[in-house]
Amino acid sequence: MRYLLQRILFYAFTAWAAITINFFIPRMIPGDPVKSLLARYQGQMSTDAIDSLYVLFGLDKDASVWSQYVDYWQQLLRGDLGLSFTAFPATVSEVISDALPWTVALVGITTIISFVLGTGLGVLAGWRRGSWIDGLLPTTTFLSSVPYFWLGLLAIYLLAGPGSFFPSSGGFEPGLVPAWDQYFIPSAVQHSLLPALTILVSSVSGWILSMRNMMVTVAAEDYITVAHAKGLPERRVAVGYAARNALLPNVSGFALALGFIVGGTLLVEIVFSYPGLGFLLFRAVGAKDYPLMQGIFLVITISVLLANLIADVAYLLLDPRTRKEG
């Protein structure tokens, strides 16, 4: 329990540091976002109205940085991430909530499939060395070394195009309204196939290799030999003894992969113009939408920290040594 408490305190400090950095970085970037907003909409406003916009966006020139920092924390604790410059007067929370489900659906499901498939193949490859799975390792290793975006471009070139089943961009057919109906869901699934295939091909080999190497190491341990000597079934030894202990490093990696779901496939979403959080961040950076950038970075930070905490809890459950040390 003490171990878990230490980890929670560490993550709390890390979250505070990340949020503090998230507050200061946009204020260090050259440019005036309010003037950019006025120029974009070609607005003519009085001086008092412009000053009100600065206050509205938390950039009051008459307030000290410390005062702005305190106000920023008060807004966060209320769940208020501010107003988006590019989607004004929509709030950052509303803009992120529109894009987040797309990323979670695409990358989340693909990451889980990749982990389950790669771990299962890794167990077989490590337990039955020299099988047909070993023959796949050079190819999968090569594909894992290829950047996401390059595989995406290659997939578009080879599989997408006029008359093809695979759309080359977007999240659904133009003219459809996002809804849980028989028209939108098939279209959304169809548009997600190529991005999902790109992520799956790039990531699955990492799980295969790491699990295979751990299985080879664990298979040489004395307790595996003892289990065989006791006459235990092969399946029970492989799954209950070898795979369970070999799985621990992959659990940590899987938790981190879940944490990076919301921001780990930026380039894939850009290549396919997929309406997820990564593509939203790309547009926010181009438009210097600082509140939106801060909101997205905050979501990514919290996601990664929560994923690490989940990994620590999983370690406590899977590894008795951790509980004894705590």
What are these regions (language model features)?
Residues L5-Y11:
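N-terminal signal-anchor/signal peptide hydrophobic helix marking the start
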Residues D48, S52, S64, Q68-Y72, ...:
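Generic alpha-helical secondary structure signal
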Residues A15-Q68, G163-F184:
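Hydrophobic alpha-helical transmembrane segments of membrane transport/permease proteins
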Residues F13-I21, V65, Y69, G108-I112, ...:
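Hydrophobic alpha-helical transmembrane segments of multi-pass integral membrane proteins
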Residues D60-T119:
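An internal, D/E-rich "acidic patch" concept
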Residues R2-Y3, I96, L100-I133, Y148, ...:
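Alpha-helical transmembrane segments of integral membrane proteins
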Residues I21-P30, D71-Q74, T139-G170, T198-L200, ...:
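Membrane-water interface segments at the C-terminal ends of transmembrane alpha-helices
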Residues Y11, G43-Q44, F115, T141, ...:
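Residue-level recognition of pore/gate-forming positions within transmembrane alpha-helices
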